[in-house]
């Protein structure tokens, strides 16, 4: 890394395990400065519950970034709306969660931070607070005014991107248009090159229907939409294999010769990845004007403050973000 960079972290739902995981992250040295966008009392109280040392130092944007020393975090303060009891949701803190996301996103957009790592949020409590919220991906897409973003989940062995994300199954076929596929594949290809450092990405593309349509006998979306788009993009030099049946694509004979998989919808690609590497996966938002990674699990309210939360996914998300920072420098 040419110089020390700052990475901003949002712990997510304050009553969940996000604060626990951030405190655990702080127990080791990091080659970047970790700036946590959160309430100070929340973090110090959670550290005390876990019996872990934590020193918070104030965020100083005009000072050079310093590598993180064990037992410390840099604090960018955002105040809670209500006091927190570990494991118990408070509706007003839905506003607090969104405020942390907005501040962290804005800091990435204005160049304060090289990457953003997000902890798990509780979508229900945010919506109950009167804030329409579908998820991190959509929130950052809108706030950054990105033209289009793509959701990817990754483990050490497998990367899966999604053509569509949080749509009901009944709406997916209509959503798979030539324009969408052109846009999604272009973003996936671009970010595999620039953020992952893969010179010539090899992408496996799932069909939409069982058996990838069986030559039109089980749906025509492959013939009408997917194949023509892939042919056009192959002619431009992209290495695309597909459309392939999703029930056979996830085999070593295909995956060993690919850098990423493009699934047509959420539950087509992610169950395989989560079965293979649950707790080790990372959620990545492609197409943003900054690096964003996240844990692949939920708030686990029942584990908050008990010292039983597994920090593995957060560590993987941070390590991947650091690698992506290096690749983009």
Curated annotation (Swiss-Prot):
Cofactor names: Zn(2+); Mg(2+); Co(2+)
GO biological process, one term: pyridoxal phosphate biosynthetic process
GO molecular function, one term: cobalt ion binding
Catalytic activity: 4-(phosphooxy)-L-threonine + NAD(+) = 3-amino-2-oxopropyl phosphate + CO2 + NADH
Compartment(s): Cytoplasm
Binding residues for substrate: 136-137, 274, 283, 292
Pfam families, A to Z: PdxA
UniProt family annotation: Belongs to the PdxA family.
Protein's UniProt name: 4-hydroxythreonine-4-phosphate dehydrogenase
Species assigned in the record: Escherichia coli O17:K52:H18 (strain UMN026 / ExPEC)
Gene: pdxA
């Amino acid at each position: 890394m040419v110089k020390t960079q700052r990475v901003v972290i949002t712990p997510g739902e304050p009553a969940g395990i996000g604060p626990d995981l951030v405190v655990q992250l702080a127990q080791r040295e990091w080659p970047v400065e970790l700036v946590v966008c959160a309430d100070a009392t929340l973090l110090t109280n959670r550290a005390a519950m876990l019996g872990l040392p934590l020193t918070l130092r104030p965020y100083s944007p005009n000072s050079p970034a310093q590598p993180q020393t064990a037992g410390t975090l840099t604090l960018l303060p955002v105040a809670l709306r209500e006091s927190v009891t570990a494991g118990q949701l408070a509706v007003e803190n839905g506003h607090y969660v969104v405020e942390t996301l907005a501040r962290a996103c804005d800091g990435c957009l204005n160049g304060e931070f090289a990457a953003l790592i997000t902890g798990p949020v509780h979508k229900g409590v945010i919506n109950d607070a009167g804030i329409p919220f579908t998820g991190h991906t959509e929130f950052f897409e809108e706030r950054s005014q990105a033209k289009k973003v793509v959701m990817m989940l990754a483990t050490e062995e497998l990367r899966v991107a999604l053509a569509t994300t949080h749509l009901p199954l009944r709406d997916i076929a209509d959503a798979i248009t030539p324009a969408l596929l052109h846009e999604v594949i272009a973003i996936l290809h671009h970010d595999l090159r620039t953020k992952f450092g893969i010179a010539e990405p090899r992408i496996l593309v799932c069909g939409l229907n069982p058996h990838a349509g069986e030559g039109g006998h089980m749906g025509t979306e492959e013939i009408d939409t997917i194949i023509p788009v892939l042919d056009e993009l192959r002619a431009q030099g992209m290495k695309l294999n597909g459309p392939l049946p999703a029930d056979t694509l996830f085999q070593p004979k295909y995956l060993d010769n690919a850098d990423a998989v493009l699934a047509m919808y959420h539950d087509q690609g992610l169950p395989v990845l989560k079965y293979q590497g649950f707790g080790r996966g990372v959620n990545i938002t492609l197409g943003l004007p900054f690096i964003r990674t996240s844990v692949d699990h939920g708030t686990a309210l029942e584990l908050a403050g008990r010292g039983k939360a597994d920090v593995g996914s957060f560590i993987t998300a941070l390590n991947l973000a650091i690698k992506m920072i290096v690749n983009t420098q």
